[in-house]
Amino acid sequence: MRDSVLSVIFALALFLECYTPSMAIPMGKMEDTALEQDTLDSLLNEEVADKNPDSVRSGSSKIIVLADSGMWKNLNRGLPLYKLKAAAAGLDRALTLDRREADQDLSPSISIVRRDTMRCMVGRVYRPCWEV
């Protein structure tokens, strides 16, 4: 039901867009509108020139800046700000030293056979937990 309502609204919007008032204006009236637009543009350009003459250059050149999408991906290593903060906090924790005594095992409650068969994720590979 929702899809049909959305398609009817979309079709209605397209139908109404075809009958805009500019389509019904006679050709002579359209030329007057173009003259009014040119006059408005020239007035606006004069206002800008009066406010800051250094910023207005001769001619009507436009500068379009296009950014490389790869540049945006590499910005902040491709991570959002909240993930960068979490990664920095994790790096601080990773740099701390963790000491274990030689006689200290992983857990005395886990039997040796079970400990050897347990698998832990190391990177992208499952390895026995005692190798970690």
Curated annotation (Swiss-Prot):
GO terms for molecular function: melanin-concentrating hormone activity; type 1 melanin-concentrating hormone receptor binding. InterPro entries: Prepro-melanin_conc_hormone (IPR005456). Disulfide bonds join 120-129. Residues 1-24 form the signal peptide. Pfam families: Pro-MCH. Pituitary gland. Produced in neurons of lateral basal hypothalamus which project both to the brain and to the neural lobe of the pituitary gland from where MCH is released. GO terms for cellular component: synapse. GO terms for biological process: chemical synaptic transmission; neuropeptide signaling pathway. Belongs to the melanin-concentrating hormone family. Plays a role in skin pigmentation by antagonizing the action of melanotropin alpha. Induces melanin concentration within the melanophores. May participate in the control of the hypothalamo-pituitary adrenal gland axis by inhibiting the release of ACTH. This is Pro-MCH 2. It comes from Oncorhynchus keta (Chum salmon). The gene is mch2.
